[in-house]
Amino acid sequence: SLGIPMIDVNHLQGHVLVHFIKEKPEDTTPPFPFLCLLVSGGNSQIVKVNAYNDMEVLGQTIDDAAGEAIDKCSKVMGLGYPGGPIIDRLARQGNPLAYKFSEPHIPGLDYSFSGLKTSFLYSLRKWVQDDPDFIEHHKNDLAASLEHTIVNILMKKLRLAVKQTGIKHVAVAGGVSANNGLR
């Protein structure tokens, strides 16, 4: 109605391809095909990228996304929102092997983070019942262990995708890609 042309842009494809925006046009061609681990507050996907407009989702979350799990666990700890930067900062000072949280055992390349959230919540409830100051005294180790578990879940499936497809080039995109443990 305004007489202005509309350009169709897929937000998730933008995340996948943003790596290839360069100053010199000749430097912008991605090494097709490649895999992209797309992780954010709303999405956890493994995408096979064949060309700029040819992408195939090989695996995705069947419930909560990785970033959503981080945000919710941060909230349960009373750390605030968004939880990603907070958990990332605390994890740098913690022991990633201090606590063991549930990891899903689902076939294929799909992700699930709801079991991890439940495991984290129930563990915290038990520990806080025994020691009301538990979170404050152990927040660095809790953050590091949570981050370690989430990265482990993400990487297991990504390694499987590399093995299944034979594609060696991998990009990581989305807000959770800023996490130091994932990098």
Model-derived regions, located:
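Short beta-strand scaffold segments in enzyme catalytic cores
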Residues: 17, 36-38, 44-48
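Conserved phosphate-binding catalytic cores of ATP/NTP-utilizing and phosphoryl-transfer enzymes
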Residues: 4, 9-34
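Glycine-rich phosphate-binding loop plus the immediately following alpha-helix
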Residues: 10-13, 50-95, 117-118, 122-126
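A contiguous, well-structured pocket-lining segment that forms one wall/lid of small-molecule binding clefts
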Residues: 89-170, 180-183
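Glycine-rich beta-strand-to-loop/alpha-helix junction loops that act as flexible
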Residues: 40-42, 170-179
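A cross-family phosphate/adenosyl-ligand binding-site feature
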Residues: 6, 36, 81, 98
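Short beta-strand-loop/turn "lid" adjacent to the catalytic site in phosphate-handling enzymes
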Residues: 1
